[in-house]
Regions:
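Structural preference for solvent-exposed beta-strand-turn elements
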Residues: 1-226
Length: 227
């Protein structure tokens, strides 16, 4: 998925039919216009970083918006990236600025603790200093829609990113239908959502999650087998 667009940018890549071993030869990078075939923040971030060294403006098109940490941080450090209907990356005309940052908690890791709190009767859990980027907290919206009580507080910013504390209180859970634009923001949390669904009082259905088959393993298959 990354070889094709990088080749279009002028990178010479030798691979074993798209698999390892792989050789990459440095070259002058060209600007491109490219539509990501699958919603993938990893592929998008690779192309953004490459585009910073391009010879002109690169335009990336997403069918569904994915997490935007790369764009936020690079803009805070001096890059010129705009993101509306398309992502437009201008090549760097100066070095990125040095920075200090307190790295917030990862929402995907926090999802396991939040799930335990939602399932255990009379639980009341607060997770502090958690990243609250809107493209990453879809899980907490899902948890709330399933019936848990979810409250955000102490909101602030760290290098352009929203950070806060989240409180979860247990309540009986109901099933939910998940599809479309929310999927990229919960793609890593679907396995734990599947576990929550086994304890809900009605069925849960997840659609448009084909990206799970292209992770380090086929996570859809793993979810079905493990549960």
């Amino acid at each position: 998925r990354i070889i094709t667009p990088l080749t279009s940018m002028g990178v010479k890549i030798q691979s074993n039919s798209g698999k390892l071993p792989i050789k990459i030869f440095s070259s002058n990078l060209k600007s491109i216009e490219y539509e990501l075939p699958i919603a993938s923040a990893q592929v998008k971030s690779c192309l953004i970083l490459a585009a910073l060294d391009g010879n002109g403006r690169t335009v990336l098109k997403e069918k569904i918006k994915t997490r935007d940490h790369t764009e936020i941080m690079l803009n805070e450090l001096g890059a010129k990236i705009s993101s509306n209907s398309h992502i437009i990356i201008n090549p760097l005309d100066t070095d990125l600025k040095p920075f200090h940052v307190n790295i917030p908690g990862d929402p995907s890791s926090a999802a396991f603790f939040a799930s335990a709190a939602a399932l255990l009767p009379n639980s009341d859990l607060t997770i502090k200093n958690l990243l609250a980027n809107s493209t990453r907290i879809g899980f907490f919206h899902v948890l709330e829609k399933m019936g848990a009580i979810v409250t955000w507080q102490n909101m602030r910013k760290e290098i352009g990113e929203i950070v806060g504390d989240v409180n979860i209180k247990s309540q009986p859970l109901s099933g939910i239908d998940l599809q479309g634009e929310i999927i990229p923001s919960i793609i890593d949390e679907i396995p734990i959502i599947a576990l929550l669904a086994t304890q809900a009082d009605s069925p849960t259905c997840v659609r448009n999650a084909e990206e799970l088959r292209h992770k380090e393993s086929d996570r859809i298959d793993a979810i079905c087998h493990n549960i």
